[in-house]
UniProtKB/Swiss-Prot annotation:
This is Protein naked cuticle homolog 1. The keyword Lipoprotein applies. The keyword Metal-binding applies. GO terms for molecular function: calcium ion binding; PDZ domain binding. It comes from Homo sapiens (Human).
Amino acid sequence: MGKLHSKPAAVCKRRESPEGDSFAVSAAWARKGIEEWIGRQRCPGGVSGPRQLRLAGTIGRSTRELVGDVLRDTLSEEEEDDFRLEVALPPEKTDGLGSGDEKKMERVSEPCPGSKKQLKFEELQCDVSMEEDSRQEWTFTLYDFDNNGKVTREDITSLLHTIYEVVDSSVNHSPTSSKMLRVKLTVAPDGSQSKRSVLVNQADLQSARPRAETKPTEDLRSWEKKQRAPLRFQGDSRLEQSGCYHHCVDENIERRNHYLDLAGIENYTSQFGPGSPSVAQKSELPPRTSNPTRSRSHEPEAIHIPHRKPQGVDPASFHFLDTPIAKVSELQQRLRGTQDGSKHFVRSPKAQGKSVGVGHVARGARNKPPLGPAIPAVSPSAHLAASPALLPSLAPLGHKKHKHRAKESQQGCRGLQAPLASGGPVLGREHLRELPALVVYESQAGQPVQRHEHHHHHEHHHHYHHFYQT
């Protein structure tokens, strides 16, 4: 039956029956078939069929009486008993008979490109116009489902195909009722206002009743949660990692700034952090190109260690006091290159380790950034003797604990005063370079802050604890 109705040429095909010749005419093609049949019957002459049909009016519910009147006029009484005309009509409750059937025939003859499965003719035979109440709508909102904030057309297409397959497999198909399923997808990157919504109307999906439609909705919600679950896990892990990273960075920056304020040295690296080499290992490292003595920046820290940790003191931190002769000679070779550039800061050969002349060098090097190897470098012990930012932190800690060392340092200074004043060959260069750091460590920890600040501003005014003579 479906093949007959899909071809217009087979509408008025003759067929033999025991009762005589008859015609099978569809309601959609009744006008064209009746006109052709009337034209063939009245071929010798007379009024043509279309004119008579125009006078009769449109084809409606009275199609059978109209065809009967035409046949009574054209056929004789004998022929009228032999011929019968059968017209296949749809149910009378359908409104808009001709237009609806024509749309149905066109839909069957031309397959829809969007539908995946071919529909049979029987399913659309009693189809009616779509009502607004029969539509069902699902809305999916995915927040940053690819973790980079960029959504391409391929992602939307693949996502819509997946949603379509899930909805199609979960909805019951019924030939009695038809509903339009509207799938609305909204992709919003992290709650921003830019949204891309795609509206897909699937008219060929059939659903039974609203009771059976709640199950696919729950399935789709669970599917959406499964899609978003790994993304939420990845986002939480990223947040935890980034928080730890920021915390570590802040802690390292605060620690580095604290040591920069204490020592007054630029590009100063922390040695209290985990995994850092010991102080004795860092003393053997080669010097940097910009400042040969900058690599020995652990010496001020070795002096700070007894103040900060008086109970558990590392014996390697006192390497400046217990340095062997081989290390002192190596230190002398390193400092020999900077001796020529720092001659104009020293007044006499005996006063090379004098804290007064070196204090200006440390002050200039601290206030101005290092320009290159041409600027003379000073030992970190001179930085300790000259930096006023270091003294307020040393005085409150060392004033109480190391108060008894002031008298010992005075006796040591007076004892060493005579050989240095005479300039005899008793003390060599190695001991001469080693003594200022030792005396600076003992004297600065015990003396008040006011005397050293006074000493820095008035370099010609000498106190009793200085063992150099001018």
